[in-house]
């Protein structure tokens, strides 16, 4: 296999992985669980410091297995019952009794959470204290990227420069663009990418869960009721929107099922997966072609998102759905040029969507971007595309760079304003 393709597969394996619960509070749970491995006894108090963006994305989302919202319960559950070896599935086996113990610690005022000034978009420092013993774990740059461990002030681990590479810079120094992703997905041996079918399995289970039980705003179930009442039809557009939103409903509502995440986001993993899976079913393609489309969607999303910080004021579901739309064109037998049209169209459609924290209404944003993916894919198949208008350049690579500029240079103050509003 080509060395470049091996790099691509390595990138996918690094940032497309199962995650139980919204990854921002789960980062605190993971840091707490790792810190607990350093202490000889259970902690008596917990202190959590996080970046503004991590704080924003933890304020309104349920922590799986707890039925509760926020960083305090995530850190306490992680410290008392988390599995430090499980990464983003750290809370998979938490029991109701352990949740009660965590809540007791919180009720006693022993769990403190505060924002801290930092240049890192993903930053979480958790300190556990038991008597005179203190363990500290610091995460920087990625949701499970441990930068430092200390016990009683003594440094016991520090990440080297290679280990400390932020998830947002994962494509740095790699020869990658939309065309190379497209060719890779088409030509790489199937057995080398078969693993990506796990994304279909995990995220489809979340979708089924969201359709069968009342989670969050029940966006998916509401659409199902509309279909049953004859108000809307069960066409490809509505089916994709309904099932993608249902998976997000379940995830943001605290379902005890993992999502296959994309670059640290479960919702974006869902947005990169479910529309592609439903389109594959519509066109009755082979399992191999589905795997190739999922690789195209997930790696395309990673590449586009590598142009801006992993947490920002920009809702990443937009560009994730652009990559999904590209893969949908491939499934329908469209050309590479038409796949580029799909990316351009989605970004033109919904690039103004902001991130105001992780919460139940994220399912609505997922449904919005998925709807844009379907419209854009249909337009692309008809060779209709947005080009040279607004932030959309004539070339797809320039458009992607424009998105990066918009987020980095134009939306930093927006992010601060959103966080300040949410903190009032």
Swiss-Prot record:
Coiled coil: none annotated. Pfam families: SDH_alpha. GO terms for biological process: L-cysteine catabolic process to pyruvate. Disulfide bonds: none annotated. InterPro entries: Ser_deHydtase-like_asu (IPR005130), UPF0597 (IPR021144). One of its GO terms (molecular function) is L-cysteine desulfhydrase activity. It comes from the Bacteria. Belongs to the UPF0597 family. This is UPF0597 protein Shewana3_2972. It comes from Shewanella sp. (strain ANA-3).
